[in-house]
């Protein structure tokens, strides 16, 4: 079993396609197929289910990908240990939920100080990003907190108010039973907070409509399609124009924190150490 075989396996699993992996790796398709087959023969088990639309991981393949992610991350960190210099450089793969308002400020400040670092940013939902950090697919992520997890370190970034957003000036709790609620997909911290609030109030929502993009949710609310709950900072540009109206949540449900997480067993490169320093600096500035 060679390291390259594991890299090919991971690429096929990511694309769910032999063709897609071959294109990314600049291999002929038959070569990728042969390497996967050789790997399956060595392990004496099928790693993929083959079907007309491509491939998907078999139960054994799902076990395999967890080990492969860790092995490849360890190799990457081993290389980084010997390449790491006093000047931060290399690649940092960072995930973020869509509504982190302070992210552009943090990234701009970081890039200005450390231009040799290539930052790769990936948007996602909180639960999805947690999983990717745990599997070493991301070096870290900005997510909704708080979080309790034994293998993840977390750093406070900031805390802000959540607000209920409607197209009407007035709102009653009973409106949840008659008006569609516009939310992100399952795994979003704001959605979880909203669902807990409704559960505490004993309210059965009329209907949940799922979206992937924040601006689509907000514009849909402005058009009267439904109501939503998001951080205040994410909607103020529409509120000041009178396109939507913001209503306070109960005090116990009104605040949500943004935290930065990283795997506690991951090698702490100078690039990551400098990012953590930048996050702390901006937190201190916001509290001043």
UniProtKB/Swiss-Prot annotation:
Superkingdom classification of source: Bacteria
DNA-binding residues: 18-37
The keyword Transcription belongs to this UniProt entry's keyword annotation: yes
GO molecular function per UniProt: DNA-binding transcription factor activity; transcription cis-regulatory region binding
Residue ranges of every copy of the HTH lysR-type domain listed in the record: 1-58
GO biological process: regulation of DNA-templated transcription
Signal peptide (from-to): none
Database matches in InterPro entries: LysR_subst-bd, Tscrpt_reg_HTH_LysR, WH-like_DNA-bd_sf, WH_DNA-bd_sf
CDD domains according to UniProt: PBP2_YofA_SoxR_like (cd08442)
Keywords from the UniProt entry: DNA-binding, Transcription, Transcription regulation
Similarity annotation: Belongs to the LysR transcriptional regulatory family.
Protein name, per record: HTH-type transcriptional regulator CzcR
Originating species: Bacillus subtilis (strain 168)
């Amino acid at each position: 079993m060679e390291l390259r075989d594991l890299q090919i396996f991971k690429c096929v699993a990511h694309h769910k396609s032999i063709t897609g992996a071959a294109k990314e790796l600049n291999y002929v398709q038959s070569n990728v197929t042969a390497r996967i087959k050789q790997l399956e023969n060595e392990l004496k088990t099928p790693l993929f289910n083959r079907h007309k639309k491509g491939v998907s991981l078999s139960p054994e393949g799902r076990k395999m990908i967890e080990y492969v992610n860790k092995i490849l991350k360890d190799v990457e960190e081993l290389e980084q240990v010997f390449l790491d210099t006093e000047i931060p450089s290399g690649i940092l793969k960072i995930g973020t939920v869509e509504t982190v308002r302070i992210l552009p400020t943090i990234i701009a400040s970081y890039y200005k100080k450390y231009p040799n670092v290539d930052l790769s940013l990936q948007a996602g939902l909180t639960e999805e990003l947690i999983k990717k950090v745990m599997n070493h697919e991301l070096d870290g992520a900005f997510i909704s907190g708080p979080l309790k997890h034994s293998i993840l370190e977390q750093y406070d970034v900031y805390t802000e108010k959540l607000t209920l957003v409607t197209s009407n000036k007035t709102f009653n709790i009973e409106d949840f039973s008659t008006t569609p609620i516009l939310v992100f997909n399952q795994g979003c911290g704001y959605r979880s907070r909203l669902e807990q609030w409704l559960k505490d109030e004993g309210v059965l929502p009329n209907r949940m409509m799922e979206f992937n993009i924040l601006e689509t949710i907000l514009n849909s609310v402005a058009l009267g399609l439904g109501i939503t709950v998001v951080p205040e900072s994410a909607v103020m540009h529409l509120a000041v124009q009178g396109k939507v109206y913001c209503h306070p949540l109960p005090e116990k449900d009104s605040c949500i924190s943004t935290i930065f997480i990283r795997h506690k067993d991951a090698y702490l490169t100078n690039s990551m150490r400098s990012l953590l320093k930048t996050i702390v600096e901006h937190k201190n500035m916001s509290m001043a």
